[in-house]
UniProtKB/Swiss-Prot annotation:
<comment type="similarity">
    <text>In the N-terminal section; belongs to the NADH:flavin oxidoreductase/NADH oxidase family.</text>
</comment>
<dbReference type="InterPro" id="IPR036188">
    <property type="entry name" value="FAD/NAD-bd_sf"/>
</dbReference>
<keyword id="KW-0004">4Fe-4S</keyword>
<dbReference type="Pfam" id="PF00724">
    <property type="entry name" value="Oxidored_FMN"/>
</dbReference>
<feature type="binding site">
    <location>
        <position position="423"/>
    </location>
    <ligand>
        <name>FAD</name>
    </ligand>
</feature>
<keyword id="KW-0274">FAD</keyword>
<dbReference type="InterPro" id="IPR051793">
    <property type="entry name" value="NADH:flavin_oxidoreductase"/>
</dbReference>
<dbReference type="Pfam" id="PF07992">
    <property type="entry name" value="Pyr_redox_2"/>
</dbReference>
<feature type="binding site">
    <location>
        <position position="347"/>
    </location>
    <ligand>
        <name>[4Fe-4S] cluster</name>
    </ligand>
</feature>
<feature type="active site" description="Proton donor">
    <location>
        <position position="175"/>
    </location>
</feature>
<dbReference type="InterPro" id="IPR001155">
    <property type="entry name" value="OxRdtase_FMN_N"/>
</dbReference>
<feature type="binding site">
    <location>
        <position position="396"/>
    </location>
    <ligand>
        <name>FAD</name>
    </ligand>
</feature>
<dbReference type="GO" id="GO:0010181">
    <property type="term" value="F:FMN binding"/>
</dbReference>
<dbReference type="GO" id="GO:0003954">
    <property type="term" value="F:NADH dehydrogenase activity"/>
</dbReference>
<keyword id="KW-0408">Iron</keyword>
<keyword id="KW-0479">Metal-binding</keyword>
<dbReference type="InterPro" id="IPR023753">
    <property type="entry name" value="FAD/NAD-binding_dom"/>
</dbReference>
Length: 651
């Protein structure tokens, strides 16, 4: 029996038959070789998703104009025939597992920086700066526009020659094609700008000439932002007009997205966005066209995806970050094992934050194998079965226990609390972070599936552990909040609290109560957000020049917008010198004194590792001890999970 019959029914794009309605949308990975060629690491990554049962893979954005059109550090290239062999190998590998593959061809336009384009000034239809990146583009000449059109055509011809099943034109998210279509970014007065029809000339000319070059029947997908969610940009009404014109031009499928860089959270949603919030856009577009429509946007559960198809709101569902988190999402859903799916929590840390803003290779908080599928293609059994004791039931400890058990070891996990989760429990209490509970629940269920013996509500001291005669002990004892050396921060003060206790619901606050949060890092800002949503008047005091600098940038961008709405204020560049019953005293860089009124004060100064004494005692007993997660080095969930996986893999 096939579960989710609509989701797993065959779909059709033009004459191309696709085995189900699940699409992996294009998502940049930085897994290409530095010269823009296809790497084995990239092939392994896509093969894992094809093997996992996805119907159609749309390859991440491939630049047609190097380096002018480049927008990420290790971006694929197809501006020369020499790159075709790698793409052919990729397509062949994906096809061997029954999936189809399209290539998204792309030009960044103004949404890039000289640091990426090897010093070249970004180009655009008009010299409208990108405020998100702080870049000033120059206006393209008519001759340059004609040259870029030809480069799109050449890339499409090469894609077909490399055995790709179709192409996708990236007209969404404010890149060059979208810039021509939008009145916000296209202020030309020649044949490529002005009226709606002239703004559409650039994409329509690309489509016309591609069809002439590759044939009428070669599938073309067009991705566009049905609503740019920014002042002066295209709205859904313009999106409907765009869709009609694209259908008339011979496009075979519409991939309906949203947003541009200036409205970044609408295209790369942080965790507060609800599942499927963008589906209504595809639904409205579908009403005005007769070609298939792909919807996208925080689609995490097969039950939700099934309903979209069953209700006719879209013809295909794009599962993006969900397939990074779990390449077997389709396979598990089809087999009725949807409860085993490791769902994306929309943290954006490894797939977007580190990749886009630090030029790192793709990673995933919940999937430590993402981007390294060739190395960890399968959990290999250890040559000798060992007894492994894990101390600590947070994300690092649970991941370590799961990995060690899957490698064939006997694993016992100790957690001093009655329930598992560690800091995941606290993190999920922050506004918009409820998805973190998905991961906590998955880890707990996976412990059971892996056969880990869990002993919760037990404090594992050295004697208890030694009595088990373990071969290895993995310490995942986490961290604890730091109490600063500030006068008045003493624990006996009844108006001073730790941020963790606030997020854990251990402290009550009255509406309109004035609260000062000392520390403007991630924990401090999330605590301030939590309190403000409960009606408190919150001020953050931070010694650095800005707040939330340790946050993933898109989530930070979104949070700052929420702070403005909630009236949260920040005093930066100030050091708190004393906590008093009616507020806090602080001093600025130039020695200027300040006093911020408060009924209650919350400490969010940071954390320090826990477990050093236990480690030393165990080692003195001759036990092999490995330390992971915050107990080793305080970091984010992604660091904890990765360290747990790596240490367990090596045992």
């Amino acid at each position: 029996m096939t579960h989710f019959p609509n989701l797993f029914s065959e779909g059709r794009i033009g004459n191309l038959v696709i085995r189900n309605r699940i699409v992996m949308p294009p998502m940049a990975t930085n897994l290409a070789n530095e010269d823009g060629s296809v790497s084995q690491r990239l092939i392994d990554y896509y093969v894992a998703r094809a093997r996992g049962g996805v119907g159609l893979i749309i390859l991440e954005n491939v630049q047609v104009d190097y380096p002018q059109g480049k927008n990420v550090a290790c971006q694929l290239r197809l501006d020369d025939d020499k790159y075709m062999a790698g793409f052919f190998e990729l397509a062949e590998a994906v096809h061997s597992y029954g999936a189809k593959i399209f290539m998204q061809i792309h030009h960044a336009g103004r949404q890039t920086t000289p640091g990426i384009t090897e010093g070249l000034q970004p180009v655009a239809p008009s010299p409208v700066p990108c405020s998100f990146l702080g870049t000033q583009p120059r206006e393209l000449t008519i001759n340059e526009i004609e040259e870029i059109i030809q480069k799109f055509v050449d890339a499409a011809v090469r894609a077909k020659g490399a055995m790709f099943d179709g192409i996708e034109l990236h007209g969404a998210h404010g890149y060059l094609i979208g810039q021509f279509m939008s009145p916000r970014t296209n202020r030309r007065v020649d044949k490529y700008g002005g009226s709606f029809e002239r703004r559409m000339r650039f994409p329509l000319e690309i489509i016309r000439r591609i069809k002439e070059a590759v044939g009428e029947d070669y599938p073309i997908s067009f991705r566009f932002s049905a609503d740019e969610f920014v002042e002066g940009g295209n709205t859904l009404e313009e999106g409907k007009q765009i869709a009609k014109m694209l259908e008339e031009a011979g496009v075979h499928v519409l991939h309906v997205s949203a947003g541009i860089y200036e409205s970044m959270p609408t295209l790369l949603e942080p965790s507060r966005f609800e599942q499927g919030w963008r589906v209504y856009l595809a639904e409205e577009i579908k009403k005005v066209v007769n070609i298939p429509v792909i919807t996208v946007g925080v689609i995490r559960e097969p039950e939700f995806a099934e309903k979209i198809i069953a209700e006719g709101r879209a013809d295909f569902v794009a599962v993006g970050r969900g397939l990074i988190a779990d390449p077997e999402w389709p396979k598990k859903a089809k087999e009725g094992r949807q409860n085993e799916i490791r769902k994306c929590i929309s943290c954006n840390i490894g797939c977007i934050g580190g990749r886009v803003f630090q030029n790192l290779r793709l990673r995933c908080t919940v999937n430590p194998v993402a981007g390294r599928e060739g190395v960890y293609s399968e959990i290999k059994q250890a040559p000798v079965k060992k007894k492994v004791v894990v101390v600590g039931g947070g994300p690092a400890g649970m991941q370590a226990a799961i990995t060690a058990a899957k490698r064939g070891h006997q694993v016992i996990l100790y957690e001093k609390k009655q329930h598992l989760g560690g800091q995941l429990e606290i993190a999920s209490a922050s506004p918009g972070k409820a998805k973190i509970k998905w991961f906590r629940d998955w880890l707990e269920a996976e412990l059971s599936r892996a056969g880990v013996e869990v002993r919760s509500g037990v404090t594992a001291d050295a004697e208890t552990i030694a009595a088990l005669s373990p071969d290895y002990v993995i310490l995942a004892t986490g961290s604890e909040p730091v109490t600063p050396r500030i006068k008045g921060a003493e624990k006996e003060n009844t108006f001073v609290f730790q941020a963790w206790d606030v997020l854990a619901g251990k402290v009550s606050f009255d509406k309109d109560e004035e609260v000062v949060v000392i520390g403007g890092g991630l924990v401090g800002c999330e605590t301030a957000h939590y309190l403000a949503e409960k009606g408190a008047k919150v001020t953050i005091v931070e010694m650095l020049s800005d707040i939330a600098i340790d946050m993933e940038p898109i989530s930070r961008f979104d949070m700052m917008q929420q702070f403005t709405k909630l009236g949260i204020s920040a005093r930066t560049g100030k050091v708190v010198t004393e906590i008093l019953p009616r507020g806090v005293a602080a001093v600025g860089k130039e020695g200027k004194q300040d006093f911020i009124r408060a009924h209650k004060v919350v400490l969010a100064i940071g954390q320090s590792p826990v477990g050093n004494e236990l480690k030393k005692t165990l080692e003195d007993k001759g036990i092999d001890v490995r330390v992971i997660g915050d107990a080793y080095n305080v970091g984010k969930i992604i660091d904890a999970v990765s360290s747990g996986f790596q240490v367990a893999w090596q045992i």
